[in-house]
Regions:
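Helix-rich effector regions associated with P-loop NTPase G domains
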Residues: 1-20, 41-44, 77-80, 84-88, ...
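Short aromatic-glycine-enriched beta-strand elements
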Residues: 56-60
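Beta-strand/loop nucleic-acid-binding surfaces
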Residues: 63-77
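Short, charged beta-turn/beta-strand-edge "cap" motif at the junction between a beta-strand
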Residues: 85-90, 127-129, 209
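Conserved beta-strand segments of the P-loop GTPase G domain that flank and frequently precede/overlap
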Residues: 122-126, 153-155
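Canonical P-loop GTPase G-domain recognition
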Residues: 149, 156-211
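A conserved segment at the C-terminal end of the G1
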Residues: 213-229
């Protein structure tokens, strides 16, 4: 005798809830964001994620939502909003679990937000003249500071003659950072990145132009949704194909951020990131006689002692000192700028308040 299971069938409301949860998970929604909202809020203000930032508009996506809305202040790709349907400009920005940023290029020293709420940063470099340990160290420090897992991805191994040398140099940067070498055009490349590209995860491809970031995103997607270009044969330099940061949802349920190449990567507010990237040098620093030791000619300098004994690589130490000095300088400059802007905004509010009283 067959049991009547009709009562066990999910209702339309249950199906809708499950579909909504699945769509949000694929966009990167998880426990960190659930903890910030009440169920009653979601009825009026559904969660949406910023997938692209344009000059005057934002592209947002959510459960059964795909819209362009007016720009908001201080938001970036990857941010989550509680969307205000009646007044999009009043949408609430949820607290970020991570934020990648840099000092904006040029003379106007501003802070530039790169991406929010990432889980993993794939730092991509070609096995050719583009390869730079110094650049990789910058990206790794930036990722560590944001509490994002950095992974070095070496591409174009099919064209390289000395792959082992590139891999060895990449692994020497930090014992805490995984190194993967692959051919970005090979369909099997996605299997090397699979452990970081699980459903609900958000990953980003960072690196110079022409290293294969968009190609890797296409490989993960299983199609050519993102335009790519070849590098110049003369110097292995890439051409800008991706002109803006855009979040793509993969068939696997992973959100992938493709970014344009960054010619300049000035660090700011990354003291902890530098400590983690250069953990061995930071540990030595604690043993110096003076807290403000410049590791040059000061007495009882633990770093100089390690250099003399051959335990420390001199070029690496010099890069570390350069990055520490750069971070201190940029952090001070941007802090002063924030104070000026805060004071300016306060004065504007005060003037408006007095005007209303009149």
């Amino acid at each position: 005798m067959l049991r009547d299971m009709s009562h066990a069938k999910p209702t339309d409301d249950t199906i809708a809830i499950l579909e909504t949860a699945s769509q949000l998970r694929n966009l990167g929604w998880g426990a960190y964001f659930w903890d910030q909202v009440e169920a009653t809020e979601l009825e009026q203000s559904p969660p949406v994620r910023i997938t692209q930032v344009h000059r005057n508009t934002l592209h947002i996506q959510g459960a059964n939502l795909d819209l362009m809305i007016p720009s908001l202040h201080d938001v970036t790709v990857g941010d989550w909003l509680l969307f205000n349907r009646e007044d999009p400009r009043s949408s609430q920005l949820l607290e970020r679990k991570s934020l990648i940023k840099r000092r904006a290029p040029g003379h106007d020293r501003k802070e530039q937000l790169i991406a929010a709420n990432l889980d993993t940063a794939f730092i991509v470099s070609s096995c050719n003249n583009d390869f730079s340990v110094a650049r990789l160290e910058r990206y790794i420090a930036m990722a560590h500071e944001a509490d994002v897992t950095p992974v070095i991805v070496l591409t174009k191994i099919d064209l390289a003659k000395n792959i082992v040398e590139f891999v060895s140099k990449a692994k020497a940067i930090s014992k805490r950072v995984a190194v993967v070498s692959l051919n970005a055009r090979d369909p099997s490349a996605s299997s090397y990145l699979f452990q970081w590209c699980q459903p609900g995860q958000t990953v980003a491809f960072l690196g110079s132009s022409g290293v294969g970031k968009s190609t890797l995103a296409n490989t993960l997607a299983g199609n050519e949704t993102i335009e790519t270009q070849e590098v110049r044969a003369s110097d292995d330099k890439g051409r800008h194909t991706t002109t803006g940061r855009q979040l793509h949802i993969m068939p696997s349920g992973c959100a992938v951020l493709d970014t344009p190449g960054m010619r300049e990567l000035q660090l700011t507010d990354v003291s902890i990131g530098l400590e983690e990237t250069f953990a061995d040098l930071h540990a030595l620093r604690q043993n110096c006689r003076f807290n403000d030791c410049a590791h040059d000619k000061e007495p009882d300098c633990a770093v100089q002692a390690a250099i003399t004994s051959g335990k420390v690589d001199v070029p690496r130490m010099q890069r570390w000192l350069k990055l520490v000095a750069e971070d201190v300088e940029n952090t001070k400059i941007l802090a002063k700028r924030r104070m000026r802007e805060k004071s300016k905004n306060k004065n504007v509010k005060s003037v408006r308040k007095h005007s209303l009283k009149k």
